[in-house]
Amino acid sequence: MATIAILNEKPSQARNIAKNFGASGFRTTRNGDNIIIVHAVGHLYQYDTSDITKMVPADKYDKYKSWDLKNLPWHASDFDWDKLVPRSDVKDVLKNLKTVFSQCDEICIMTDVDPTGEGQVLGWEPIDKLGFSHKKITRAYFSDETDKEQTLKAFDNRVKLKPMKQDPEWKMGAFRQRWDFVSMQFSRITRNLGDKKTNLPQGRLKSAIIRIIGDRLAEIKAYKKIPSYQVKFKDSNGNIFTKGDAEQYPKADDVPIKDFKTGNVQLVGTQTKKTTPPALLTLSFLSSALESKGYKTDEVLKTYQMLYQSGFCTYPRTEDKFVTPDQFDQMLPLIDKIANLVGVNPKELTHRKPRKTHVKEGGVHGANRPGKNVPNNLQELSQFGPSAIDIYVLLARNYLATLAEDYEYEQQKANLKEYPEYTSSISVPKKLGWKSIYTDVSIDEESEEYKSFGRTADPYVYEGFPPKPAQPTMKWLMTQLDKGSKANTGVKKEAIVKRTEEILKLLNEHGHKVETSGIGTGATQASIYSDLTKAKKVKGKIVTHPMIKSVKGKLQLTSQGQMSYELLPDTYIGSLELTELVYAEMTAIKAGLLNMDKCLDEIEFFVKQDLQTMMINSEKMRKNLNIEVNDLVDQKEKEVLEFEGKEWNVSREWGGERFTDQQWADLKAGKTIEVTRISAKTKNPYTVLGKLSKQSFKGDKGTVEYVGFENLGFAPKKECPNSWGGHVFTDDEKAKLNVGETIYVEKLKSAKTGNFYNANLKLEDDGNGGKKIVPSFG
């Protein structure tokens, strides 16, 4: 009898697995083995992005500590990638895992299965860092944690893993993790080449989003509404007859309209056409559809996650856009109940056989769809958040549409007997099919209204304009991201395209293919979009401003976003082809066809090129946006001073301001000085006493010593306060008190009794170098 630990990704997953295993207190038995179910809370270990010097040799500390651009690019080989640090908020979780792992003969990773290998990395981290890699490590693959039969089967069929650094999925996920870490260099570049004080975060997806929106806004700004004129015909029902290559005229008066007369309409053909139901929704398109109802993307993501954890929806971060035959069969018994719940007549769901377009072998979790737990009523879902009901209804109707018949319409074509080159067509609905259930939220559909052809059509002068680019919306953005490099309207980075083609050819020769497409998964797209629309705060202070804002559903760049956009032209990090390269490299690394370290080294080339390109872009950007930069703005002035027989770098600033020359001289002489600063919270001035002293703080590397200004507390008040005893002093009263005179004040209020009294007031010494108000009576 062996003891096996099942490691889940998060508490909710552990609860579901425990329920499926019939565990009591997260302990049970199966097939004669003892089972202990434990969990992480996402990634328990991470790279310390706040101090990357922990990961490099001591002789390279200064290079990686400094934000000076001369220290770029980084060398991926300089980093000790094993130096992951535990999150500060997971000590108890790690303690529990260490206790349980020490009791076990085997550890089974049962985290989420995703196409990037993240679940594998997340599972290996605590096993490796806590020192249990020597034990038998297995992996259970499943797609739905709420499915008892499936999870038990996955556990019974678990696969023994190779050592961590030989595990193909770990290598794939670790490469992506390290690539994104090293890409922080681009953010250092944009801060330095921006206004030197604003963080402008960059990354494969972040930069692509800014680039796509910025390009569209630039197209709109450059658009010129230049009219042209031509002859068209219109029948009595408003149908327009157009000639494909009609001559265009710059002025309306130039159009020879008198040469045309009324034409007779004749039907020249009819054709019955069908459209199949739209694709199943990704999380990004679901979020964009709900944004139009006023729901923030962040709220939708959180609510969907809770719906999933309760079994009402399937795995949100899926990359799949279809379901498997087994998943299709599992849904069939639930269809009528779901339909009645969301207001769909089950009799309309007559296509209950798998569609080749929506049901395929392969994939992992299957596309987003309702879960196996069907609520008794929609109000039951409101406990999960304001968007919960709308999420479920949209998701359900989207899936139910695949069980309805095709939309069928008759396309009628007509022309004019006298001018046969002038044609028109209309679509006449015959069977609504799936359109009676669901409106495709992934496209902007045109009106379904139509009118039959009239008998005749009259000529008229048509004023036309070049089509104006549509305003960017979240739905539009997600469509562009799904297109990947095909969304690129500019010049492609040929070096990336060529390298990607080489890797794809290599994969094809060995029978592999890239499972991911577009720029990011649907869940990642929605998550990064949400990040870019809100400020990031640390200890109440904004460290990163929003880059995008949505105004009545239309996307705009903030001033920070515009700054970032104008730094991106012709860069590799802003290339829409970059993610496709990374996906190809991930797949090849997993397949053992490429070396992870060599792929990471390629980033040096991108950084070198982008640094030069952004320097050129920076000059244009600062000129366009009227940004003046002080090269010293982001540097604290320091001076090397000898203190207690040792040299120290000592800051000449405190409280956001520089010490005056006299204050600095007094501090260096060992004197205690008074310093007045403005409170960041109250905006009022305050005065403190302080001196230079050796101090210390506890950091991740242990106790760190430094010499700096020591705040000794507030300085004694030497002038009259603004008020006392409920009485607000006038300027004249304060002037008299400050020169030692006595004033008489009526209706002073006792703080102890609340009673009013009259008294003589005088400003006297308080015995501590300051002044205080002293009352006297009589």
Q: What positions do the PLM features span?
A:
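Intrinsically disordered, low-complexity regulatory segments
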Residues: 1-185, 446, 454-456, 465-468, ...
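Basic, low-complexity terminal or inter-domain segments flanking catalytic cores
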Residues: 2-5, 24-26, 127, 137, ...
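NTP-handling and nucleic-acid-processing catalytic cores
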Residues: 13-18, 195-228, 232, 390-391, ...
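Active-site phosphate-binding and catalytic loops of NTP-dependent enzymes
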Residues: 25-28, 135, 163-168, 189-192, ...
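C-terminal or mid-to-C-terminal helical accessory/interaction module adjacent to the motor/catalytic core
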Residues: 95, 103, 150-233, 270-274
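Metal- or metallocofactor-binding catalytic centers and their adjacent structured scaffolds
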Residues: 164-165, 249-279
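Structured, charged N-terminal subsegments at the starts of enzyme catalytic cores
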Residues: 276, 281, 285-293, 302
